[in-house]
């Protein structure tokens, strides 16, 4: 029998998230996380889904090689070791593929070199992704390793959406353009939303709102992305937990010239001290809503700014698409924060967008419609599953996949 298991790895700068899936039925066999790698006391949480009983280890994990060795040992205890003949491939999340990678790719030396060449446009993410890949390749050099790129789904954008209005020669020389991120999530949710509507992806136009601590919007026409809110980096677009999103670029020059801030200080400000946390000191939407309900004016203003930006993108992408069949909310805030969904859609009745308050209040892990039955445009809540998407794309490349259609 052909191997049917795929290990999905998401390697961050000081963490490794992983899931082991059986692609015969897309079931999860184990999930886990190693965090605080290289920080003295590291923590591993491993859950075999056969028992559902988690194991936690706290011990020094010096680097990603040691982390993956620990993961392999924990999987082996459950009979799910990396040396199993049932393991078909390892799928890696890679944040930035630039224009070079438009689809999942089996990793070889040339692919590694190109991911490394893209580090200047993804200095926080690609180095960690590369470390995870190289470590996994050393553990199982005989096994296919597949890179699934966050940017790939957005490579279908027309040049009119992807190009910035700056000097073409300068832009090309320094690879300055809109790449977009969260593409794995947008791809999964766009197909899942079409399924929820009972239609083929090629027949629907969607606005997908991935609202987590990081947040992005995309306009999807017939299954292909035609615009997205994040740009050269994940800083552009919506107001996020700690990122500013859109603003006048001259703010940067002002802060450097008048405020005396360095490049690194401005970078840190806009990426980690802005957005909701900069506006009200909190980046947890649950806490912000609690404060709003208690009459906190600063939290209320932060919420209003967040919603204002979100509405602007919904309206803009409605104009880009011309016809919209559904607006889909996903990720931590999008899936769980009913007040965010209600506020974002409020006042858009002329566009055919309405939220049913009772449906919107229901909490569920299942995809669902929260607009009235007779609404012209569906408003949907569709839980994302980036790990399953990576596993499906990986398995499609190395075996026979069972796609979400």
Swiss-Prot record:
Q: Show the active-site residues.
A: 150 (proton donor/acceptor)
Q: What is its main location?
A: cytoplasm
Which positions are annotated as binding substrate? Answer: 93
**Assigned GO CC terms:** cytoplasm
Keyword ATP-binding (UniProt):
yes
Task: Specify the enzyme's EC class, one word.
Answer: transferase
For site (Transition state stabilizer), what residue positions does UniProt give?
182, 243
The protein's GO terms of the molecular function aspect are:
acetate kinase activity; ATP binding; magnesium ion binding
The answer, when asked if NADP is one of the entry's keywords, is no
The protein's required cofactor(s) are namely:
Mg(2+); Mn(2+)
> What keywords does the record list, in alphabetical order?
ATP-binding, Cytoplasm, Kinase, Magnesium, Metal-binding, Nucleotide-binding, Transferase
Q: Which GO terms describe its biological process?
A: acetate metabolic process; acetyl-CoA biosynthetic process
Binding site residues for Mg(2+): 10, 386
Q: In which pathway does it act?
A: Metabolic intermediate biosynthesis; acetyl-CoA biosynthesis; acetyl-CoA from acetate: step 1/2
Q: Where on the tree of life does the source sit, at the highest rank?
A: Bacteria
Task: Quote the subcellular location field of this record.
Answer: Cytoplasm
Q: Which InterPro entries match?
A: Ac/propionate_kinase, Aliphatic_acid_kin_short-chain, Aliphatic_acid_kinase_CS, ATPase_NBD
Binding-site residues for ATP, renumbered to this chain: 17, 210-214, 284-286, 332-336
- Record text on cofactor binding: Mg(2+). Can also accept Mn(2+).
HAMAP family, per the entry: Acetate_kinase (MF_00020)
| Role description | Catalyzes the formation of acetyl phosphate from acetate and ATP. Can also catalyze the reverse reaction.
Concerning its family, UniProt says: Belongs to the acetokinase family.
Subunit structure, as described in the record: Homodimer.
User: What is the protein named?
Assistant: Acetate kinase
- What is the originating organism of this protein? Streptomyces avermitilis (strain ATCC 31267 / DSM 46492 / JCM 5070 / NBRC 14893 / NCIMB 12804 / NRRL 8165 / MA-4680)
